[in-house]
């Protein structure tokens, strides 16, 4: 890992809050091209599921056992570590779910998604067949019970059940909208000032991109970034847990990686990566302050985002469009959303 990248990732957590995050993750002075890729395909019909293979490759097979030392002549081999797999493979397991409107990978340790992938188009957002009032938060029975985030974990926790794929992005179908309410699509998020405010404005920005681009793909997920302890000047990863007993991790930050496609075969893709702290953010804070090098998100998350896209097809999103939010009060936004049903 380069010293520059370490500094970017570490410094983003050195001081809590939006200002420090934005300052440390800033692209100012960084002329490197964003290193990501996303295959450009014709926008599917709104009701069609998005295959995981469009964004991420299939997980690699379990590694083969290392060669063992030669056994003594005429005797049994000394050890057989892979014999343990007769009783079960320990993992880790990433629960991959393909929904009608998104694909997600679930982290059994934190009880949050690793990532969620969605695809929005002008056509998909123009249909209002889903009614949020008919959707309910539900536990995901596809996740083994002992690894599952539960409704009671969020009860009186002080955190919102924060959608990673927004319900408003899947309003073209009631079933698709309902699937966004699985707890496997949620993370604990600060409510006032973030989930109900700045984060919601950010989601709206993503939807508004479809006025300029015919196809927009978005990867969203949590981060758990280190912070320097002033007592000993060392770096620690520290985050709250909710639930009784503690069960669900509270992310320190959230990322979005945006692929805005021009719709042409082999055409350009405008890429934008953003990291926001899980904290109250003033509505007058410029969105572009949270723009980061994509490599920083990859280093911090341990993920790679579509590395098959040639460099010559990549454009910087915020150089191609106005990266800014439009502020709407929560009550006004909910009322407006309800009228569209």
Give residue ranges: language-model regions.
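Domain-level detector for secreted/extracellular nuclease and nuclease-toxin modules, and
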Residues: 2-341
């Amino acid at each position: 890992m380069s010293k520059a990248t370490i500094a970017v990732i570490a410094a983003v957590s050195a001081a809590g809050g939006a200002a420090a995050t934005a300052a440390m993750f800033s692209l100012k002075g960084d002329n490197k091209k964003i290193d990501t890729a996303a295959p450009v395909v014709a926008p599917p019909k709104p009701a069609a599921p998005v295959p995981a293979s469009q964004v991420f490759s299939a997980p690699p097979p379990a590694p083969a056992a290392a060669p063992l030392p030669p056994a003594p002549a005429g005797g049994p081999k000394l050890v057989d570590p892979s014999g343990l797999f007769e009783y079960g493979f320990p993992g880790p397991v990433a629960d991959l779910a393909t929904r009608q409107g998104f694909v997600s990978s679930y982290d059994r340790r934190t009880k949050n998604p690793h990532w969620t992938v969605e695809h929005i188009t002008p056509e998909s957002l123009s249909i209002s067949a889903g009614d949020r009032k008919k959707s309910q938060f539900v536990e995901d029975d596809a996740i083994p019970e002992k690894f599952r985030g539960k409704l009671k974990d969020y009860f009186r926790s002080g955190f919102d059940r924060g959608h990673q794929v927004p319900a408003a992005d899947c309003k073209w179908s009631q079933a698709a909208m309902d699937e966004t309410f699985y707890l496997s699509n949620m993370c604990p998020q600060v409510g006032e000032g973030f989930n109900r405010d700045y984060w919601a404005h950010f989601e709206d920005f993503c939807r508004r991109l479809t006025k300029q681009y015919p196809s927009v793909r978005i990867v969203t997920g949590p981060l758990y970034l280190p912070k320097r302890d002033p007592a000993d000047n060392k770096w620690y990863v520290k985050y709250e847990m909710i639930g009784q007993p503690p069960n669900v991790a509270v992310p320190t930050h959230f990322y979005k990686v945006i692929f805005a496609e021009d719709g042409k075969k082999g055409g350009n893709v405008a890429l934008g990566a953003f990291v926001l702290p899980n904290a109250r953010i003033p509505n007058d804070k410029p969105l572009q302050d949270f723009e980061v090098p994509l490599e920083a998100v990859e280093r911090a998350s341990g993920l790679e985002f579509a590395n098959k896209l040639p460099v010559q097809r990549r454009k910087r999103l915020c150089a191609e469009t106005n990266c800014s939010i439009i502020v709407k009060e929560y009550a006004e936004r909910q009322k407006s959303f309800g009228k569209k049903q």
